[in-house]
Amino acid sequence: MNNPFDKLSEISVDKPKTVIAIAIIGIFALSSFAQYIVFDNSEDAFWPENDTTSLLYEVEDTYNVDLDLVRSIVKFDGDLEEESTWIMLANVESQMLGYEELVPFHYGLFGGSPNSGPASSVMFWQQIQDPGSDTWSSGVEAALMNVVMSDDENLSSAVGTAMAAITSIPSVDYPDSTVLNQWSETSSVRGTPSEWQARMDSGDNNADTINNLIGMVSGLTDGRAIEQNMTIAPLQGQLMGALSPLNALQNLDMKSSMMSMFPTESRDDPWTLANMALITVAIDTKPSLHEVELETEVSVLVSDMSVDLETSLINSVNIEYSENDELTVFSFSRFAEEQAGNVGAEIGMLTSASVVILGIILWRQFRSVRDTSIVIFLTLLAIGATYGVSGVLKLEFNAAMNSIPILLLAIGVDYGLHVVLRYREELVNMDSEGKETMADFSKEARIKALKTGTMLTSAALVVAIFTDMVGFLSFRLSSQNFLVVFGTVIAVGLFFIYLLSITALPALLTVLKPQKIPVAKSVKVEKSKFSTWSGEQALNPMTVVVAALLLSLPVGAGITQLEIGFDFRDQLDEDIPVVANFLILSDEFSGQNQPPLYVVLNVEVFSEEGKDAYLNSMSVLDADPSITDQTGVWEVLELESSRDSDLREILDSLDTANPEWLSLQDWADANQDLTFRYLRGDFKQTVISFQAPTLDWQKTVDFVTELDNSLNEEGEASISGRGLILAQVSEDVAKSAVASTGIVAGIILIMLLGINISREKTPQRGILKGFVMWLPLSIVVIWVYGLMGWFGYQLNSQTVTIGALTLGLGVDYAVHFVTRLDEEIEHDPNAGIVNWISITNATTGRAMMAAAFTTAGGFAVLNLSSLLPLRLFGQVFVIAILLALVSSIILLPCLMSIFGLIPKEESSV
């Protein structure tokens, strides 16, 4: 079968300058399209297309707004029973609220206020619920008694005095920066921390006092004349407007909401155990508000604001820190920018290290800095072209693509190594008598050797490459988008590497002057003890085959020990401060670095049935101690009713015989700016958002399964959320590993069968030969997965592809070996099986070993990565390379001997 690319190799040697110009100009032009690659380092890039994902996107599109949470993580020396700690926390929150760069973007996420912190929570509790801080009710009560006791003559005066007393009634507005600055001034009313903490722990509130005042207000007109009632009516209206909101807030559990600001393990006794606190300011991240066009631009701006805020807080003269206090500022924008920047820098560092290591290994083979540089340069060009095609196709890159440059570099260098070594081998075998260096050969001899060596290498490469390409393109059948992109990019990259190896590489070797490399060091083709031993094994092949099968049993059993390691934290470098903060929020604060999970209720929201379904779901969430910050539309309505007396009346009617559901719907329709985060516009769907730890995928799957069962015992509800989907992706990793390996194995088998049927004399022999070439590859995959299991390696975003990559690399080795073995049999039919295999291993086998060590060296640099998935991938792939090499040069010839694919005659010599 003729190789359609042989013509390109001939042209490259005959017209090298033209080919070089076309290759370099074309690839640089193509590489420019790399700017259109879509980079997505978020979790979304790994997500499958399923009902849970669709539901989440529906929820986020319907209810979410563009915002970020700027959070100060304050580590304090001492505990919360010290007044100095609270003064520091109050000052930090006040400074955050007043920070000029953030003020224009404040978003009223927390009941209409942008801030949430321990100090403001205490001051709000003191303001609306704390009996010990009640300095106003006695004065209001006295003023009301004065109105009750007044007669017509002094009624107006008494009403005026009572009107003035209304100003002493606390407002229900959440503390702002000005109020927070008054922490020390209000401490005399509040008392020492131990005093007010005891009152907060008791759960006492002002409900009885306020209800008593409301009763007095309602009775002011009893027994009065109409004229007197007209005088009293304005007082009644203003008092009810001030007291009703306060009364509505008496049942709020202020302490529980504040506990989410302290580490989870300290919540049983936060006042003595807590050593950290969260202070949060919500900001709007709509691009238009920041006067930019793209969300990515906003992310950079918010990240910079977070860094500047941290510096400002640490250096503020208005905040008195103790010696061991620490403060850092976290925002999701800062996390995204610094993590992405670190990954990009690390990939650049690893790629550079890989180039250095590969250069050293290649130089040891070539003994030529020039030839080493050419091979590496062309491989880098091929990688650039690959990224250019990826940009044209607008492929979406994510964290799973981090290993692609190193993978292509290591494999691409192998192809160049095969071409250069085969060229030198052909040149030496042609006529080396009297030649001491490579420069001593004539130009004609070099050109002939280049053509022959390139085309012979290409004959093996073209089979291996297109088998690999079809195999990796079969990833497009996967439901995992990142596997689809990974397979496509690898297939494109392999093609460009092959193309440059058989065109630009021989063209450059033709143009450049030959170097004075000693012939003895340029290439080794003599038999070694190992090559002779490998040939002798084919005389008694069953020994090797049985040993391989016996080895496969215990090693393969390790597959049962394989675990999934697709946790998002593995994609993170904990040495980056903002990443460390991200993990603190997850580990110490019940996953508050995570987007919320959602309970979705499809029901007529404003109806008896809808409210019951909501309350039942809320009771299930409240019963789980790991769940925090559960909130929804009814919490919003209750909070807003403290400010809106009309809404309060509507809500109060819901428990009567004449509930005003339609009025409530009208109110919600008129106030969508308050309810849109939890209520769909048609009032037939509502969501409850809540926080729960979701970094551990298995615990998340189990947790959500149990929660889903509990919710559906009380009615029909669905659960979605980013943490849940990531857990499902983790669960699918094992399936993807099996599916991708199985698909690639099947495709490679079909390709090998088809190629060998077209090359062999009979279809039967072609089928047998294709199967025998494939069999060692499948055994190697079993070995690789088995060793991963025994050594404790996990399947993650990188190693999930190891089975398919092992097959792809293994088929390269198998095709190289069999192609060269066929050449040796054809060249000297009487040499015998030992000589055929020995010479094959002494020549192509030696090049395969060099290529394997080169590839292994390239992947070894991944052990320098700070990211666990990349380190594991590098280690596992080195194992896979060595096993694939061993199977090709030892096991494969023995199998071919057993199945009669190698003539049995021995040489008479």
PLM feature spans:
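Feature of extramembrane
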Residues: 1-354, 359-370, 515-742, 763, ...
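Membrane-embedded transmembrane helical bundles of large multi-pass transporters/channels
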Residues: 1-41, 46, 150, 160, ...
